[in-house]
């Protein structure tokens, strides 16, 4: 991760600690396209830096991650795929289908799928690495990139984390 990514995540964590109103505005921003909710601008725009236009992939990813963090501000050292795989392993059977649908999303609707996934993680208090998610989303939302490799990495992380651990009882038919 870059210093810019680390600074942005530290900024979100500081907002969590001291400004519930900011988190409310960022959560509400998820009802809009990334970067189009004016009340979120004071908390995100300064990090957009040299984003040349309103559809810049990094700018869109910053807004998306800010809203997702506000929805579930639990930072952890696991990727999105690993977090969802852990949720699946812990007995949430419908997660696999939702995860496959998320992998099939395009740049225009990925945030909606992520909002649903993050809500499920929040319900089970499973955190994830928002800095990594920011970098991943920047790639996903870049129209010049094919998100195929990212999809494959998320799938590998999911299925590795979904494997039963030695102390997990196996289901019987």
Describe each PLM feature range.
Residues 8-173:
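Basic, alpha-helical nucleic-acid-binding regions used in initiation and control of genome expression
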């Amino acid at each position: 991760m870059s210093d810019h990514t680390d600074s942005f995540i530290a900024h979100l964590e500081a907002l969590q600690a001291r400004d519930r109103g900011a988190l409310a505005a960022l959560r509400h921003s998820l009802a809009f396209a990334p970067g189009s909710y004016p009340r979120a601008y004071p908390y995100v725009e300064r990090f957009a830096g040299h984003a040349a236009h309103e559809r810049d992939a990094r700018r869109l990813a910053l807004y998306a991650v800010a809203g997702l963090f506000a929805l579930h501000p639990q930072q952890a050292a696991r990727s999105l795929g690993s977090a969802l795989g852990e949720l699946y392993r812990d007995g949430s059977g419908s997660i696999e289908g939702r995860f496959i649908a998320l992998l099939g999303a395009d740049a225009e609707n990925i945030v909606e799928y992520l909002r649903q996934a993050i809500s499920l993680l929040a319900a089970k208090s499973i955190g994830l690495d928002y800095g990594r998610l920011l970098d991943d989303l920047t790639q996903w939302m870049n129209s010049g990139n094919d998100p195929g490799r990212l999809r494959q990495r998320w799938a590998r992380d999911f299925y590795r984390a979904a494997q039963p651990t030695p102390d997990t009882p196996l289901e019987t038919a």
